[in-house]
Structures are given as C-alpha cells and as structure tokens.
C-alpha cells in the first residue's frame, strides 16, 4: 500500500484470466476452471480493492440454485438477498468465504501450491512446481482437429457474434457490464464501452468465429462469451503466431453449469482450425504456470472522489486538504513538442515501438496496420501523444487507454474513470518526464486514477510520481509453450 505520507490506494482489481480451449485463460485470458463461479476474464486492472481480477463468488446465488425446483436459466427469479442492504450482503458473503477457505481461486503461489488443478492438468501448460529451462511447444501441432463444436448444457446454443450489428454489440456490452470482473469487495465492476469492445475485439486479422457466444435457445438471451484475437508474439528468441484470449464471461446464474471450460475448449478448437496452437493470456489468479508476474500501481488524480468511493483511504495523520495538495499536478504538460498522434506519425511510431521492445523477453510484434489500430487516438478509448523536436522529428511517445468502472451502491458517484498505461517509448525525453506529462494529460481529460503495471521500465517512475502499490498481482501465461519465467521488468506486453 502507499507510504504513510500518502493516501493509501486500493488497486483496481486486475484482469481476470483469459483462456483457451484447453488453454489457459488466455488472452487467452485464463480462467480458474476449478472454481467456475469466479470465472470472468479481462486483462486490465479493475478499480480498487484488489488487483486480483477474479470475480468474487456469489454464494448467495449458488445457494438459491441448490434449492430444489429453481431452474438454472438466465430467467431465474432474483435472489431474495438483493433486498438486504449492500453492507449486510457483503458481510454475509465474507462470512461464507471464511467457511470455504481453500475453495476460491489462488491469489498467490503459496495458495496455489495447496490447490488441485484438474482442468489445467489436462492442458498443455507446465505444472506449477515445474522448473522450466527449455524453450518450445508443450505438445506438437495437431493434424486431426475436431470438426464439431463442443456440447453445451441443454437449452444453450453457440452463436458467433456479429459485432458489426449494434444490437448484438449492445447485448455483449450488457452481458459484460452485469457479469464481468468485479473487485473482491463488490464495489467496482469494469464498464467496457461498446466502442472499446470494437477496438479490443476487431484488430487487423480478426475473425468472426472467434467472437464466440452462448445463447439460451428459447429466449435467445446472451449468457456466455469468449474471444480470441490474432497476435504475433516474440518470446525470448522465438516469434510465434498466437492468439490473445479475452472477455471470458458466463452469466452469474449459469456459473454452476461449468460452462467456462466448454467455452475454453470451443475457442481453442476454433483457433486450432485456423492453424494456431499457442496463446498468451493474463489472470489475476494463479494457475499453472505463470511465465511472469506483474503488479498494478495506482496514481490518484481525483483523490477526493477516490476516497469518497473507498477506492482509496486517508492515511494516518493526513487530512483531505493535505492529500489533495500531495497529488496536485501542473495545469499543463512541460515537454516541448508534445502533441496528439496524427496519421502522419504512424510509420515513425511503428519504428520507435519495434526498436524499443527488443530489450524485453515477451513482446508483441506489430505491423504498421496494427500500430495504427492500437495507437491512433480515439476519444474515450485510446490516447497517444508524440514528442516532436525542433527539427520536426518524432522522438518519443506515450499512450494510455480508457477503462471506466461502475461504482456499485454509492449514492452520488456512479462511474470511476481510469486511464491504463499502454506503451511508452523514450529516446530523447526522460521517461520520468514523459509519464509526468501523461498524468497531467489524463487529469486534464477528467480521469480519476491512472493505473500502470510494474513491467518494462515502469518501476523507474512509479514511486517518484506518487503511485501507490496495488494489493494483487497480474500473472502472464502462455498456452502450449514452455520457457523460463521472467521478471516483470522483462515483460513488454500490455493486454487490454
């Protein structure tokens, strides 16, 4: 947590795992299939509370399902406990968790060592305790790939979502908004906008069959989803065509049906059909076996609001006024020549990024078309600023994406606007100055908090710029690829 002289900041809960067919959670964000009620995927950090990204189990819903004649469909009646005060519900949930220690997802390697991973033990991933010194696939590419989709629970059917249809896109937005990643205290939930989802799910090379939905046959209600997007990944000395799996989400009322493992197997099957056999993904929980572990850090931009919604709290001997003074930022950036990225900058941004990432062990290999997609500014989605020197040369750039969280059960504040550090490349401007300006720009744009992982060179500026450490980790995983693990400073990949 933050130093005593600062406001203690609760990190946004990190992304949930992502997964693949028998893959990992993968960005395949991996999911903890041994504890399906917690499955929800995502890559980024959520609002405070914990950086685990794993959704808190809704035991009250599960108990209701066990009571006899209730069906497990998405049309079930609302749980009676919803009529209780939010604080009381949270107390009951905490109490239930105390009686089920060992049942939830592991947040640390120590906890993970005491778990059994029946699902992951069947997948081509290293075992948790395995020491890996080699590089290469866990199993060879498959020749005989299953042609038929995997079987879903009765009453459900597969549907490849056409996100070009605004109605379908809104359905996906609603599913994620109501069932995706929350922090462990059920105070914040990621709120991916429809436009953000198009950005995240339709990069160059996207395939419609990799937007894999599950619907109720009778009502056509969307109750499950998992996605894959193509990515060329450089891992140590090897470049591999992979996928990133993201947005694994199952409707809360279907969590007992073990739909998540079927979603993972099905997306993996579809990926295999396209000749891709490796994936990368992140998870806020520990699964077999992380290739790297990073931590979220959070920098207050609007400390009063963050404290009011309990994202942060006042440290000992700190008043609100002193806290606001502590986090005060300049009115404008100080780097000369800093301006929003334009179309003409795409080639040089591509060149700068490619050269910069060579120092890390796990990185994306982007084409110029991909750089345009991921970095060209879009309001409320992605911001990129370049530094142009007196000679008209672009020498540096910074970028951050927008991911708000819904604030649940608060009388005044309904949304927390969070900026997430993306890729920041420096050749002439010191990284500390570049990131100080990133904070100023985010504050000018109305963000409440600026989040960053401690990967790449980020550790060099986090404490100096008054970031507070989060209370959870984000694990990086590879599906069907073995290699030695690496420190956070060698991870050069940021997943949305």
Curated annotation (Swiss-Prot):
- Biological role: Adds a myristoyl group to the N-terminal glycine residue of certain cellular and viral proteins. Also able to mediate N-terminal lysine myristoylation of proteins: catalyzes myristoylation of ARF6 on both 'Gly-2' and 'Lys-3'. Lysine myristoylation is required to maintain ARF6 on membranes during the GTPase cycle.
Keyword tRNA-binding in record: no
Q: Which organism is it from?
A: Pongo abelii (Sumatran orangutan)
InterPro entries the UniProt entry points to: Acyl_CoA_acyltransferase, NMT, NMT_C, NMT_CS, NMT_N
Write the Enzyme Commission number(s) for this entry: 2.3.1.97
- One cellular component (GO) term of this entry: cytoplasm
Which of the residues bear the PTM Phosphoserine?
31, 47, 83
Q: Which GO terms describe its biological process?
A: N-terminal peptidyl-glycine N-myristoylation
Keyword line: Acyltransferase, Cytoplasm, Membrane, Phosphoprotein, Transferase
Could you say which protein family the record assigns here?
Belongs to the NMT family.
Its main subcellular localisation, reduced to a broad class, is: cytoplasm
Name this protein carries in UniProt:
Glycylpeptide N-tetradecanoyltransferase 1
Residue ranges, compositional bias (Basic residues): 55-66
Which EC class is the enzyme in? Answer: transferase
Q: Which SUPFAM superfamilies match?
A: Acyl-CoA N-acyltransferases (Nat)
* Positions of region (Disordered): 1-82
Q: Which reaction does it catalyse?
A: N-terminal glycyl-[protein] + tetradecanoyl-CoA = N-tetradecanoylglycyl-[protein] + CoA + H(+); N-terminal glycyl-L-lysyl-[protein] + tetradecanoyl-CoA = N-terminal glycyl-(N(6)-tetradecanoyl)-L-lysyl-[protein] + CoA + H(+)
> Which gene name does the record give?
NMT1
Q: Which Pfam families match?
A: NMT, NMT_C
Compartment list: Cytoplasm; Cytoplasm, Cytosol; Membrane
Annotated GO molecular function terms are: glycylpeptide N-tetradecanoyltransferase activity; peptidyl-lysine N6-myristoyltransferase activity
Q: Which residues bind tetradecanoyl-CoA?
A: 118-120, 247-250, 256, 258-260
- What topology in the membrane does the UniProt record assign? Peripheral membrane protein
């Amino acid at each position: 947590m933050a130093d005593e002289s600062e406001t203690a900041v609760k990190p946004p809960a990190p992304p949930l795992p992502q997964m693949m067919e028998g893959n990992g959670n993968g960005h395949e964000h991996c999911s903890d299939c041994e504890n399906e009620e917690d499955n929800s995927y995502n890559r980024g950090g959520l609002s405070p509370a914990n950086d685990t990204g794993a959704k808190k189990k809704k035991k009250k819903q599960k108990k209701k399902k066990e009571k006899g004649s209730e069906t497990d469909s998405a049309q079930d009646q609302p749980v009676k406990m919803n009529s209780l005060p939010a604080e009381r519900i949270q107390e009951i949930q905490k109490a239930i968790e105390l009686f089920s220690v060992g049942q939830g997802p592991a947040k640390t390697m120590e906890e993970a060592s005491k778990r059994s991973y029946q699902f992951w033990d069947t997948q081509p991933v290293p075992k948790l305790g395995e020491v890996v010194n080699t590089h290469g696939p866990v199993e060879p590419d498959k020749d005989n790939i299953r042609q038929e989709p995997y079987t879903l629970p009765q009453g459900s059917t597969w549907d490849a979502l056409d996100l070009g249809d605004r109605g379908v896109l809104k359905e996906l937005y609603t599913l994620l908004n109501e069932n995706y990643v929350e922090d462990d205290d059920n105070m914040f939930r990621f709120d991916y906008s429809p436009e953000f989802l198009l950005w995240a799910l339709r990069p160059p090379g996207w395939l419609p069959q990799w937007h894999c939905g599950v619907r109720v046959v009778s009502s056509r209600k969307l109750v499950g989803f998992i996605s894959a997007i193509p990515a060329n990944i450089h891992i140590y000395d090897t470049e591999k065509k992979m996928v990133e799996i993201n947005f694994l989400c199952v409707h809360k009322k279907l969590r007992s049906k073990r739909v998540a493992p079927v979603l993972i197997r099905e997306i993996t099957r579809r990926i295999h059909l396209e000749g891709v056999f490796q994936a990368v993904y992140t998870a806020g929980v520990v699964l077999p076996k992380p290739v790297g572990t990073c931590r979220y850090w959070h920098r207050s931009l609007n400390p009063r609001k963050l404290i009011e919604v309990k994202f942060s709290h006042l440290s000992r001997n700190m008043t609100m006024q002193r806290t606001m003074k502590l986090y005060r930022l300049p009115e404008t950036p100080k780097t000369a020549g800093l301006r929003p990225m334009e179309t003409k900058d795409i080639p040089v941004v591509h060149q700068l990024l490619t050269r910069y990432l060579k120092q890390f062990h796990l990185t994306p290999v982007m084409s110029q078309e991909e750089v345009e997609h991921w970095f060209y500014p879009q309001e409320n989605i992605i911001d990129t600023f370049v530094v142009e020197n007196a000679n008209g040369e672009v020498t540096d750039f910074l970028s951050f994406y927008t991911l708000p969280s819904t604030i649940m059960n608060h009388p005044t504040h309904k949304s927390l606007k969070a900026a997430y550090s993306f890729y920041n490349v420096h050749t002439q401007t010191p990284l500390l100055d570049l990131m100080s300006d990133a904070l100023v720009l985010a504050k000018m744009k109305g963000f409440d908090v600026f989040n960053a992982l401690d990967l790449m060179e980020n550790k060099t500026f986090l404490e100096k710029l008054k970031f507070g450490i989060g209370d959870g980790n984000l694990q990086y995983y590879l599906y069907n690829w073995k290699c030695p693990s690496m420190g956070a400073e060698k991870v050069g990949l940021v997943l949305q």
